[in-house]
């Protein structure tokens, strides 16, 4: 009996595969992560109980999740938008850093009331982030230079620029630490308790800063643009069929610039919101790889901005819960990075199964069987 593996291109993707992929991906990543926990002599049930249940049932845990979700969601949108246009923005980390640097410069050098200073900080951050993201977009639109390479290389440039500025012109505070001067009260984002009607009666809002409102506004704006406007339709059309979009008179150059500029601005907002809301000053490594974590966030939520939000919250839980597991069980902090890598790996695998229908054909005729003998096959 001969066995043959067959790959047939799918004409349509089954609904269960299209919508179930994110859930199956997360479950598979957690399952393999559980194997790693067993290898470390840690009960996966206990560890995941601490990571998820205790984190989401305590006020401190929920507060930390919402605070960490702000830069993660905004950076996730920075990757999600180009992804909808068929592009890959690997440079969200650099755009986040540039936005944080620009906003910090305004915060420590401009003396204005909070009502004017905060918008100016966020505007400066958006301009810097959009400019940094616009470079790979322009190179791709003008000369078809691979945006993955250029956006990634610009991230390294941003990291070196940050190191120089925090040890030179922007260094502040006491000692020789790579950090800026501390933000004034006018440059600090207020808690939600004083901004949301009835917020004073919600204990959680006392420790969650207004950056959460910025993230929510960005998600709503992205959803409206992508689903209710012609430009959003063109972004999706260019991403699904570049050549057909060109023949229909759509400008892919405009689309490329739009998604990168807006995405870079969102990533920059995440950077300055994290500093003005949580840190109080720009410190080196203030955002531990949030821009790179945005990649699996965008891949998980690539169907809509709402799913990007859910993915951002999931990874925020991973960060906060991972720290708790590290303390409770002595598990290395790299566990969260392992789960992130597994999510990306399984997402890439799922894309293969979305594109191809895998089948196994069994030929039972043998060499001496008549020509009309039948075999069998199994496909999924």
From Swiss-Prot:
<keyword id="KW-1003">Cell membrane</keyword>
<feature type="transmembrane region" description="Helical">
    <location>
        <begin position="94"/>
        <end position="114"/>
    </location>
</feature>
<feature type="transmembrane region" description="Helical">
    <location>
        <begin position="328"/>
        <end position="348"/>
    </location>
</feature>
<dbReference type="GO" id="GO:0005886">
    <property type="term" value="C:plasma membrane"/>
</dbReference>
<dbReference type="GO" id="GO:0022857">
    <property type="term" value="F:transmembrane transporter activity"/>
</dbReference>
<keyword id="KW-0614">Plasmid</keyword>
<keyword id="KW-0812">Transmembrane</keyword>
<feature type="transmembrane region" description="Helical">
    <location>
        <begin position="20"/>
        <end position="40"/>
    </location>
</feature>
<comment type="similarity">
    <text>Belongs to the binding-protein-dependent transport system permease family.</text>
</comment>
<feature type="transmembrane region" description="Helical">
    <location>
        <begin position="255"/>
        <end position="275"/>
    </location>
</feature>
<protein>
    <recommendedName>
        <fullName>Glucose ABC transporter permease protein TsgB13</fullName>
    </recommendedName>
</protein>
<feature type="transmembrane region" description="Helical">
    <location>
        <begin position="115"/>
        <end position="135"/>
    </location>
</feature>
<dbReference type="InterPro" id="IPR001851">
    <property type="entry name" value="ABC_transp_permease"/>
</dbReference>
<comment type="subunit">
    <text>The complex is composed of two ATP-binding proteins (TsgD13), two transmembrane proteins (TsgB13 and TsgC13) and a solute-binding protein (TsgA13).</text>
</comment>
<feature type="transmembrane region" description="Helical">
    <location>
        <begin position="202"/>
        <end position="222"/>
    </location>
</feature>
<dbReference type="Pfam" id="PF02653">
    <property type="entry name" value="BPD_transp_2"/>
</dbReference>
<keyword id="KW-1133">Transmembrane helix</keyword>
<comment type="function">
    <text>Part of an ABC transporter complex involved in glucose import. Responsible for the translocation of the substrate across the membrane.</text>
</comment>
<keyword id="KW-0762">Sugar transport</keyword>
<keyword id="KW-0813">Transport</keyword>
<feature type="transmembrane region" description="Helical">
    <location>
        <begin position="305"/>
        <end position="325"/>
    </location>
</feature>
<keyword id="KW-0472">Membrane</keyword>
<feature type="transmembrane region" description="Helical">
    <location>
        <begin position="59"/>
        <end position="81"/>
    </location>
</feature>
<feature type="transmembrane region" description="Helical">
    <location>
        <begin position="148"/>
        <end position="166"/>
    </location>
</feature>
<feature type="transmembrane region" description="Helical">
    <location>
        <begin position="282"/>
        <end position="301"/>
    </location>
</feature>
